[in-house]
Amino acid sequence: LTVLGVEGFLPGYGVYEGGITASARRGFARQTGPRTFDLSRSNVIALREFVPGNRLYANRGTFYVSRYHLGADETARIRTLHVNVEKRYVTEQTGDAQYGQSGGVPIDAVPLADLDLAHESRITEDESLRFSMPVSVLGRLRKRNRGGKAFKIGDHEVSYVRGQGIELVNLGEANRVKQGELGHWLCSVCGAAKTPYAVPDEIKQFSKIHKERCGKDVGRLALAVQAEVDMLQFHAIASEAEGINIGEA
């Protein structure tokens, strides 16, 4: 899951859940500018695209995430996960010695929700490259599926599983995650978001405003989605490198 999540393969197909909607709305006082529109993605694709700091291209303009629609349900579902960036795992427990998952760093995670987009600029002819923010996504299997089949390919035992429950967690901008800066700057009360590329003074002002308005400190939160997917599971893979080779094959 982690390998496929990092490479952006997860998943576009065989997903049973609905999607996430990003809405761009023209302000009440504005008579010009981009028209109102919605972008929809499956939740696992949205986990990579609809995140603070990423740039979205649509309707001849560029847009960024400004606010998530965090209702009472989403706020109540904030929970602490434990992640180990070096070993590339995420768990709900402090550690699982059976699978070598110990020494994880705690981080609060909120379910990815529908969101509002803000207009940044118009797309110009000078833009030959489009920006896509690199993110760190970890995945884990949940204890539910709809059964399947087991077979062997060469030396590898493989299971074809239908409706396997998975959870994917976006820890933030990839380079900052490597430096130990986990999570996205989010207000857990109103859902306002700040890009990880903001300078410290901007982050400080953002935190101050939402502390005064919302009555709660702004923190770094991971974004999480759960889904059911059809999958091939290769057993007894010796290393991550071998897993990457098999996945790309």
Identify what each model region corresponds to.
Residues 1-249:
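Extended Lys/Arg-rich polyanion-binding regions
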